[in-house]
Amino acid sequence: MRICIFMARGLEGCGVTKFSLEQRDWFIKNGHEVTLVYAKDKSFTRTSSHDHKSFSIPVILAKEYDKALKLVNDCDILIINSVPATSVQEATINNYKKLLDNIKPSIRVVVYQHDHSVLSLRRNLGLEETVRRADVIFSHSDNGDFNKVLMKEWYPETVSLFDDIEEAPTVYNFQPPMDIVKVRSTYWKDVSEINMNINRWIGRTTTWKGFYQMFDFHEKFLKPAGKSTVMEGLERSPAFIAIKEKGIPYEYYGNREIDKMNLAPNQPAQILDCYINSEMLERMSKSGFGYQLSKLNQKYLQRSLEYTHLELGACGTIPVFWKSTGENLKFRVDNTPLTSHDSGIIWFDENDMESTFERIKELSSDRALYDREREKAYEFLYQHQDSSFCFKEQFDIITK
């Protein structure tokens, strides 16, 4: 089949971009023709995070309507992974909506909703029109704001006596899959190459990524024990001002200054701003423990781990995840909480950091045990969210 993957918001370089690239790879691996198109009307800071330039096609929606229409109509299945942002010019959104109206009726339109909160959802333009053109819709959680707020606004269950009730379409749950085997084959190191004293956090400068807790854990436990902490992805955005105002000790480096980073004992947290994903994974694969401390509200959690969760387990470090995330997410295989399994993952409890630290000490002092536990974590994450299972599950829904 001919597939067109369209990012109408643009190439952000974060989760939606990663999803689109993983999706493209899976389709090609399974014998389909794929075109990857993205709008260039809005610029983003992380466009170099992933390799895409050799095959992706940029369009300026405000000026290249005919080019965009030809691309999205030259397929059997059109997958829309994002819609324009509220900050784009009027011509961009007008042409995007016009595009929706002129998609060939024969094309099956699939919409993935990657945002969680209603605040983020309302920063999109043309989302309702996109949903109404869709044949298949996916979201992360049955209880999230997309399902429970926006879909109910667009498809109210009660209307006036003079109107017919419009039945809401089904919204299917999805997980963002990753080729976990491929990541392992690229980055996994022998256990003898791992520096057990390096603790490496990855995320962004947004509080739900858990950077304050990582700073706290470093100062109270890791630093006194002579261990080092590196935090990758903390950009100097407006949110970073609060870190400075709180007087949190740190040393900050740009991506080109990484060789200057001080990984000696008894140092403050070492911060790296934007990272190149492949370079980060190489560094992570030689680090004793990798931290992904996202802490979303329970209503947004159903089955989906983030890509950074999966990357930690796939590259060969011991993953450390936020405990309540694991309590609320269900394992794909048996629908039980992730924390109920002997998974090899360390579950970070901000109310009991000492137990987290004791587990880190135990694994650091026994490389054979460490090796067994990271293999366990890899297998668990593979079964939970590998491309071979999850994209197949989604494709079966798309084509049924």
UniProtKB/Swiss-Prot annotation:
It comes from Enterobacteria phage T4. Its EC number is 2.4.1.26. The keyword Coiled coil does not apply. InterPro entries: DNA_alpha-glucosyltransferase. One of its GO terms (molecular function) is DNA alpha-glucosyltransferase activity. This is DNA alpha-glucosyltransferase. Pathway: Genetic information processing; DNA modification. Pfam families: AGT (PF11440). The keyword Ligase does not apply. Interacts with clamp protein gp45. GO terms for biological process: DNA modification; symbiont-mediated evasion of host restriction-modification system; symbiont-mediated suppression of host adaptive immune response; symbiont-mediated suppression of host CRISPR-cas system; symbiont-mediated suppression of host innate immune response. It catalyses: Transfers an alpha-D-glucosyl residue from UDP-glucose to a hydroxymethylcytosine residue in DNA.
